[in-house]
Amino acid sequence: MSDGKKTKTTVNIYGQHFTIIGEESKAHMRHVAGVVDDKMREINEKNPYLDINKLAVLTAVNVVHDYMKLQEKYEILERQLKEKE
């Protein structure tokens, strides 16, 4: 959870080091980076001939797709809860 204080950490995503600054904990930022790294490797396994730029874009598209599906499910659950009130 964010407390307003900036945190800086270095992460490794797909063999590249990135410095990330945010309001979340270092553990959270490392976890996020790990999820991105895992997704990139998953996509690369299915199509090893993608260059790094295409791999990064496809990773972003996949992650946003997953996020949007979860958001839709959340909104449905919220509506169901309101209907029960």
From Swiss-Prot:
It holds the Pfam family ZapA. It is found in: Cytoplasm. The keyword Lipoprotein does not apply. GO terms for cellular component: cell division site; cell septum; cytosol; plasma membrane. The keyword Ribosomal protein does not apply. Keywords: Cell cycle, Cell division, Coiled coil, Cytoplasm, Septation. Residues 59-85 form a coiled coil. GO terms for biological process: division septum assembly; FtsZ-dependent cytokinesis; septin ring assembly. InterPro entries: Bac_CellDiv_Activator, Cell_div_ZapA-like, Cell_div_ZapA-like_sf, Cell_div_ZapA_firmicutes. HAMAP family: ZapA_type2. Activator of cell division through the inhibition of FtsZ GTPase activity, therefore promoting FtsZ assembly into bundles of protofilaments necessary for the formation of the division Z ring. It is recruited early at mid-cell but it is not essential for cell division. Belongs to the ZapA family. Type 2 subfamily. Homodimer. Interacts with FtsZ. This is Cell division protein ZapA. It comes from Bacillus velezensis (strain DSM 23117 / BGSC 10A6 / LMG 26770 / FZB42) (Bacillus amyloliquefaciens subsp. plantarum).
